[in-house]
Amino acid sequence: MSAVLGRYRTSEAMWERMRPLIPKPVDHHPLGCHRPRVEDRRAMDAILFVLRTGCQWNALNATGICSSSAAHRRFQEWTQAGVFWQMWCAGLMEYDELKGIDWEWLSGDGAMNKAPLAGEKTGPNPTDRAKSGTKRSLLVDGRGAALGLAVSGANVNDFKLLRETIESIPVDRPRPTRQRLQNVCLDKGYDYDEARELLAEFGFTAHIRSRGEEARLLARRARYRARRWVCERTHSWLNRFRGVLIRWCKKPENYVALLHLALTCVNHAVAGLSG
């Protein structure tokens, strides 16, 4: 147990940020006689273990962290209460206070992942022989901190998720001005008039590479790197969390909750915070 907890346990710094967001439990037993409730810290350690390793919930019984039923039940309770979304919001606000969100250059992109159990917001993956898959759409700031998230089936075009991704930004966004434009860098998957009109509607300045344009730039400048590389890096960081690398959750709200927890960890790392 100590070896497992030593590697995957929630750090003290992160737990101190999470603890105020966890709701107090309500005792529904008429006599108050029931088994002792597993500590919130141990339940969070178990959830983080599942997120990092991608193991089945039932495998938690072998780790000694806590029982699989207790961890999964607590995960469902906190998902319904919006705890993981609040953690993501609180992490973004703290990041904004410490470093300031870089609104000048934003980047967006989508990434597809396998979803063997299917469920809502999944679809045939065109890059995986039409097997069941899911797509996550991210909007990040200039340093790679995730500001927006949307989930859909793998067969949905990236630009179709742009509105939902922008509208999911949980923090107050400053108003763009002529002196301080808010630029959004996107790849050729967003090369549609609908995407440009949508960005203009929200006050963003669009920078969308047309089909073939980036290939020509790379041919002339071998070391050329698009500004949106920070978004691709954030997707890569998310894939290190094996619990979201392959979507085993049939319910989309459970998958989104795991993504919010993973993004909380990513944003803390971008902010230079321990844990």
What do these predicted ranges mean?
Residues M1-G275:
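Short alpha-helical elements
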